[in-house]
């Protein structure tokens, strides 16, 4: 266990609104096709929600644009400073560049967008309200592990009906499958704290499905700061998380940004339990390295995303393409 823990160390707008019992979203389609029109008008929020939490994302239907997008919110104290949106050029859907502005947990009455450059096509901005929920860790449940290859206990897991009880976050109905020989650990690069982690998972689902255009959350599992493990694509399902080399992998994502700080003890404990289960179930030696066929690299059996990328892997994402 200790060895494993050390190892892990003109603006044109078209507005669409739909509301469900638990979630709602608004789409703004904006054109930045003139130098004098790089800042949109401000849009008053029309979606009804009992919770202030919202995620702000965007996509452009073109490959690897160099555009930088921003948004700002009008709150009770007035307009805030512009917030940059992180650009992504790797996704399951070719011909799409996506942006993520993160999650806000404050109430706001209006939103505005801007681009640093003109763009030939429209930009779709999404404001997604993941819905209200109890501000505590969701109840978890464990499916019967009978028939599994491993004798060690499977950790408790919050399945989809646990983190999305409304049923409005459907899984892929025709997934592809893979036999994993490597376990890939990620972080979401979002906030390290939240009042409602299940809502954060629903926001990731919305970003991956409705902004990225994927079939489901890209990871197989996620772990929050309270140590709750969430099933996303689930075991043996081909994910979208390892730079076009997803075959033979299981992707596990820690919710938060751990470039400068380590995950807390609860998250690490659950990660170790999940990795121990997966390694035992799939007969993977956790502290060794082996050949990974999809990347054509010999990498640690428990790796991070950085172990295989466009600069190191022969079969990584070609420059300028969109694949995870």
Question: For each of these PLM feature ranges, what is it?
Answer:
Residues 192-193:
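Cysteine-dependent hydrolase recognition
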Residues 38-52, 65-121:
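Beta-sandwich interaction modules
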Residues 22-63, 136:
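Solvent-exposed, flexible loop/coil segments flanking beta-strands in beta-rich domains
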Residues 1-25:
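Bacterial Sec-dependent N-terminal signal peptides
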Residues 103-105, 127-188, 224-236, 240, ...:
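Basic/polar, cationic surfaces and motifs that engage anionic cell-wall
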Residues 196-211, 216, 269:
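Glycan-recognition patch characteristic of GH18 chitinases/ENGases
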């Amino acid at each position: 266990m200790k060895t494993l823990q050390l190892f892990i160390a003109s603006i044109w707008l078209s507005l669409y609104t739909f509301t469900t019992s638990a979630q709602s979203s608004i789409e703004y389609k904006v054109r930045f096709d003139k130098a004098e029109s790089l800042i949109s008008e401000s849009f008053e929020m029309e979606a009804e929600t009992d919770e202030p939490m919202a995620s702000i994302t965007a996509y452009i239907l073109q490959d690897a644009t160099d555009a930088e997008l921003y948004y700002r919110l009008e709150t009770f104290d007035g307009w805030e400073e512009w917030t940059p949106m992180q650009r992504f050029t790797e996704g399951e859907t070719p011909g799409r560049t996506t942006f993520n502005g993160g999650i806000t947990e404050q109430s706001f009455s209006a939103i505005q967008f801007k681009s640093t450059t003109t763009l030939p096509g429209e930009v779709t901005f999404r404001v997604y309200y993941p819905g209200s929920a109890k501000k505590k860790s969701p109840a978890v449940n464990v499916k019967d592990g009978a028939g599994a290859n491993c004798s060690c206990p499977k950790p408790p897991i919050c399945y989809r009906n646990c983190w999305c009880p409304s049923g409005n976050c459907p899984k892929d109905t025709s997934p592809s499958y893979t036999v994993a020989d490597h376990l890939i650990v990620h972080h979401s690069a979002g906030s390290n704290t939240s009042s409602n982690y299940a809502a954060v998972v629903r926001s990731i689902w919305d970003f991956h499905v409705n902004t990225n255009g994927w079939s489901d959350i890209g990871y197989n599992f996620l772990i929050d700061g309270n140590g709750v493990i969430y099933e996303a694509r689930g075991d043996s399902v081909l994910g979208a998380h390892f730079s076009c080399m997803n075959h033979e992998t299981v992707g596990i994502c820690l919710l938060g940004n751990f470039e400068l700080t380590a995950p807390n003890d609860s998250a690490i404990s659950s990660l170790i339990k999940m990795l121990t289960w997966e390694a035992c179930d799939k007969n993977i030696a956790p502290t060794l390295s082996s050949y990974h066929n999809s990347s054509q690299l010999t990498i640690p059996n428990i790796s991070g995303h950085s172990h295989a990328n466009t600069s190191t892997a022969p079969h990584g994402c070609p420059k300028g393409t969109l694949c995870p």
